[in-house]
Amino acid sequence: TVQPVDATTWYNDVYVGRQFDATITGLDAKNITARAMLERFVSDNGKNFVNYNNPAYDELYAKARACTDDAEQTAVYQQMETMLTETAANLYLQDMADLVAVRSDLTGYTFYPIYAQDLSTVGYSE
């Protein structure tokens, strides 16, 4: 049974308390580094709210942290992403659109990399 809950309940029971069988939530990882996103799946990471536990993944993460070569670190990150995909750590249902089209006579628009847009500063040029 899917039980809708408010954001505070979700944060306390799921994110902090880890009291769930499955959860559906919106996550936006556009503004964090690859390392910050991938470290969320390390077994003992406090932000690992999906309770992913994989010693092989943890070893790859430690290896990536120890890398001094960008190309080598990128290759390890790719291995980690492959492992997350193959073990179904998460199931992504949507990829937020990040395209915006505006008329040439509109001014003041600022693009935000999230679904909400502030149109209070938009106006017509004269």
Roles of regions detected by a PLM:
Residues 1-42, 76:
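Periplasmic binding protein-like
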Residues 9, 13, 33-36, 56-63, ...:
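Extracytoplasmic/secreted proteins, especially bacterial periplasmic and envelope-associated proteins
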Residues 22-26, 68-104:
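Bilobed periplasmic-binding protein-like "clamshell/Venus-flytrap" ligand-binding domains
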Residues 6-8, 28, 70, 99, ...:
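Short, solvent-exposed coil/turn elements at secondary-structure transition points
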Residues 14-19, 39-66, 95-126:
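Short, solvent-exposed loop/beta-turn-alpha elements that line the ligand-binding surface or hinge
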